[in-house]
Structure formats: C-alpha cells, structure tokens
Swiss-Prot record:
Gene responsible for this protein: kdtA
Gene3D superfamilies, A to Z: 3-Deoxy-D-manno-octulosonic-acid transferase, N-terminal domain, Glycogen Phosphorylase B
Main subcellular location of this protein, as a coarse class: membrane
Enzyme Commission number(s) of this protein: 2.4.99.12
Function summary: Involved in lipopolysaccharide (LPS) biosynthesis. Catalyzes the transfer of a single 3-deoxy-D-manno-octulosonate (Kdo) residue from CMP-Kdo to lipid IV(A), the tetraacyldisaccharide-1,4'-bisphosphate precursor of lipid A. Is strictly monofunctional, i.e. is capable of adding only a single Kdo residue to the acceptor lipid.
Protein name, UniProt field: 3-deoxy-D-manno-octulosonic acid transferase
Organism (species): Aquifex aeolicus (strain VF5)
Keyword Transcription regulation (UniProt): no
Length: 353
C-alpha cells in the first residue's frame, strides 16, 4: 500500500516505456468493465496506458492485461505528480471514463482530453472543468445541452456505455426454459409459486434457477421439492426445476430461456444486471426493487424489453402474456448503435492529433 501511494506521488520512470500511448483512466472495476467494449477496439489501434484509482481495481486489472500495455495508479491530484506523469509518458491523449473531475489532472496536463459516458449534475467543479476537455461524449442530449451552457465546445451524445451488450458464447440446451438469475432468499418462493401456476398451462416448461449466492443452491432445491417439483442440478436436465450450483455461467445460460427473471428485485436489494438476457433477444421480468439499476430499467422499458411486476400474481400474468406471444427484442441492435457512435467520435478525434 505504501509503495502504491509513493507511485501516485512520484510516478515511476518505467512510464517511459509507454511513451506516446493512449492514456485511459477508469477509476474502478465498474468503470473499466463499462468501457471494455470500446477499449477492446482501441487496443487494436493504439498502445494503451491504463490508470485506476480504486485499490481494489489494481488486483482485478492485473488479470486483464490483454487490454492494456502499461498499468499505473492515477497520480495524486497535485501539479507536481500529474506533470511528472505526463512528462514521463508523453501520452497521445487522455480518455477519462464517467465523472473523474480531478482539478490538477485536468488543469495542469497539456495532453488532449476526452470525457466519455459523461452525465450532467450541475456541480460547480463540473461547470469549471468541463470546458477544459477537447471532446466530450455524453449519455443524453439533455446532458449535452447542459454542458454547452457551461462553455464546453465539442460535445456529443451517443448514449450510455452501460447499455452495450457484452455477450459470451452462450450454452445450447434442448427444451423450453425460464431462466431465473441472481435469485436471493426471500424471493425464491415468489418465483416457485408463479412457476407452479404457469406449469398448469405449459407442462413441458422447465425453470433454471440460479442463486445469487451459490451456497444457497441446496436450500433452493429443498424449497422446490417442498412445492412438489422434481429437481435436478445442472447439467442434468431431468428436473422441472434445475438448480445451478456453479459460478460464472449465468450470462451463458440466458440464451436458452424463453423469458428471464432477474433477482435482487423482489426483495429490497436494488437489482442486478437486467441487460444480459435482453442482449440475446430474451425479455426480462423484474420486481419493484430496482433502485440500483434504474438507468437500465428505464432503457429496457423504453425498448420494450423489460417488464416490472409487483408481486407473484403480476408475475404469473406477465409470464403467461410473454409465453403466448413471441416478443421481438432489439436491444442488441441499439447496443451496436451506441458502440458505433462512440468509436466513430473517438477515432475521428484521435486521427486529427
């Protein structure tokens, strides 16, 4: 930790190895993953110098070395540290992801600066520093208009980077499934009750049940048996309810579903990733507790891909409706538009340097 602080105050000479690279700053793991679809494309065209702020991000980013050439903590926000960092690395440009308004970084560096996935809050620091960026790509046109009143010049809207699909290969299974992902204790009963009702009409339908915490798989399996369901564990597909007791495959399971249900939304958790199933053209249902994913919820409802239900009765009604009529989900198309817009603006700017 002391060494990390020293590197922030007195950036390392080894930065000279990354001279002329494109400097990308993603403060945390969340910002890195949000920007990753764009970073993958930029890495094909530029050497990348990646900086981070969160100490937790360092260990995670070490496992993602395919996407950068040099990794260094963000210099401390004082004139000496940021100037030394720039002097050693001589970057081609700086891309700042989201709302990293560090005054010394933005004021005392001479490198061309780009702000991406930005949104307007109207804070004083935002009003002062936004005009220091040479290119700003924002989430909405309303954000653009607000930043223009602050004196920002080259400002565009491309949408929210969080809405870009990041799909895996997907798993192929025979049968008809509802996939319930990231389910917490306290909401599993709601889903099992609704599924029991749906099975009266759709007897061949199966439920793939993925707990948020894998250690709950056996508890959920017992609850399913208590409801009278035949159960099995993935990859055995003989049960009416198939429990998943392994990490990291939920994203790959969504494409087998006719419908997805995302957890953390029927209890007061705030929701998990609502986007993943819709990237495969699968409609997603969620409960009323979505305060952590409101931006995704609003986007999906606008695209006709997301559906909120308040209780078990509404869940049965919505499942019946979506099972009876094939719904066309075009989220991936919208995702490609957003990604294409960001890449077009960034490439155009970088070509001009």
């Amino acid at each position: 930790m002391q060494f990390e602080v020293l590197k922030r105050f007195f950036p390392k000479e080894s930065l000279k190895n990354c001279k002329g690279a494109l400097w990308v700053h993603t403060a945390s793991i969340g910002e890195f993953n949000t920007f990753l679809p764009i970073l993958k494309e930029l890495k094909r065209e530029h050497r990348i110098l990646l900086t981070y702020f969160s100490p937790r991000a360092r260990e995670y980013l070490k496992t993602k070395s395919d996407f950068y050439d040099c990794l260094h903590p963000l210099p401390l926000d004082n004139p000496f540290s940021v100037k030394r960092f720039e002097e050693l690395s001589k970057p081609k440009a700086l891309i700042v992801v989201e709302r990293e308004f560090w005054p010394s970084l933005i004021i005392f560096t001479k490198v061309p600066k780009i702000l991406v996935n930005a949104y307007a809050k109207g804070s004083l620091i935002e009003k002062i520093l936004s005009k220091k960026f040479d290119l700003i790509i924002m989430r909405t046109q309303e954000d653009v208009e607000k930043f223009k009143t602050f004196g920002a010049k080259r400002v565009f809207s491309c949408g929210n980077l969080k809405f870009i699909c990041q799909k895996g290969k997907g798993i192929k299974l025979k049968g008809e499934f509802i996939v319930a992902g990231s389910i917490h204790t306290g909401e599993v009963e709601i889903i099992l009750k609704a599924f029991k009702e749906i099975k009266k009409t759709y007897s061949s339908l199966k439920l793939i049940l993925v707990p948020r915490h894998i250690e709950n798989a056996k508890i959920f399996e017992k609850k399913a048996r208590d409801f009278g369901f035949k159960t099995s564990f993935f990859e055995n597909l003989e049960g009416d309810v198939i429990l998943v007791d392994r990490f990291g495959i939920l994203k790959e399971l969504y494409p087998v579903g006719k419908i997805a249900i995302v957890g953390g939304t029927f209890v007061n958790i705030g929701g998990h990733n609502l986007l993943e199933p819709t990237c495969w053209g699968i409609p997603v249902i969620y409960g009323p507790y979505t305060h952590k994913v409101n931006d995704l919820k609003e986007f999906l409802e606008k695209e006709g891909a997301g559906f909120e239900v308040k209780n078990e009765t509404e869940l049965v009604t919505k499942l019946t409706e979506l099972l009876s009529v094939k719904k066309e989900i075009k989220v991936e198309e919208k995702s490609r538009e957003i990604k294409g817009c960001y890449l077009e603006k960034l490439r155009e700017f970088l070509r001009g340097l």
